[in-house]
């Protein structure tokens, strides 16, 4: 057995007692008992070293997805999809790639409850031979917005009122009812699917449309689905509320304990594909994040499985400091023109640079350890700890440091790329009747399972009953655009709650 480590200062100086401080005794004359000890000394490096580091322990929490849990695992290719994608990590059935997945809530702070009614983040980093690939998904196949500039507005309404610092139902519903494209996601959120029973028992969806291309340069639009082998299980509103009080870290604990005892969660991986010509025949834009692709027209195709089988050794170093971005991609995959996705390509690395520093890619959990990295331009900056490429010239030079470059992917084959014409215009997505069609279909899907429609009505009513009456009226109208009966049922439920609140309680 090796000797235990020696306690030291940050500079490696051995410490005999971690709790002593340097002080000057007072003159003990006249003191009946032990005299008080005098002032501290600024020269006490051990004390200053300890306190100054403690003062800087916290970094900014994520502006969204602050509360999360993660684990390492392995992805395995189960089916050949090289006709669709030329990414090397997908080129052979049976091939395995190390991954890290982080689950999270969206709107809450780091100390908030895991069971809050909120979408769940579902982000996975693949450590591939062509660099790191990040698939930054949610547990819902759609989202609240499709105009990216609305994102800060939307998120502010889901957080705290700037005056009261309280969650504000008026803010929450004021924004949503003024932006009808949110209806599909809001119905999903206020169904029981808005409160997953655990991170292990929920699916993951790309939501966005991506473009994948094969070795010939032929490309298709793609949506990705992760389907939980544990099944999908949700909480009723009452259960979620109870757990928020009794065990606010319920989902974090559930994931950790399952992996610790060898009950490894896994997900099957599927894609939907669509050609450019097929996209032109859709009743909605292929780049609309508030819509799903009908499975009967675009069936699921299996391509892999991933299993989470290793808990992090240190939450801060790994789960907290891991940095995901949809711009972290590999050859064979690229973003589409989905405007919300395009905005995330900038925003995610930008917030990492703010939160973790410009060299966040050097943090071990973010390093492309399998492929390595070499870019003589990216040098220096705060916390550059990788050797800074030594004396290598800091430009692409052919003089004394020849560099190899990757082979460019082949140009498109028989499938043409999108064509862009016209002038730059200010664009704001306009609502159409189809914006209410998929919410209407979702209401019918809920009707296939007893109690699901009733849960949606009750969950909305419980939330909006705290809002002002004119906001409530807007909520009834909002849901009625999907199906008039939904607005009527919510109105009746809110009125019932008001009567109960106003009636004298019996002792």
From Swiss-Prot:
Belongs to the catalase family. InterPro entries: Catalase, Catalase_AS, Catalase_clade1/3, Catalase_core, Catalase_haem_BS, Catalase_immune_responsive, Catalase_sf. One of its GO terms (molecular function) is metal ion binding. SMART domains: Catalase. SUPFAM superfamilies: Heme-dependent catalase-like. A motif (Microbody targeting signal) lies at residues 505-507. The gene is PXP9. PANTHER family: CATALASE. One of its GO terms (cellular component) is mitochondrion. Its cofactor is heme. Its EC number is 1.11.1.6. GO terms for biological process: hydrogen peroxide catabolic process; response to hydrogen peroxide. This is Peroxisomal catalase. The keyword Heme applies. Heme binds at residue 348. It holds the Pfam family Catalase-rel. Catalyzes the degradation of hydrogen peroxide (H(2)O(2)) generated by peroxisomal oxidases to water and oxygen, thereby protecting cells from the toxic effects of hydrogen peroxide.
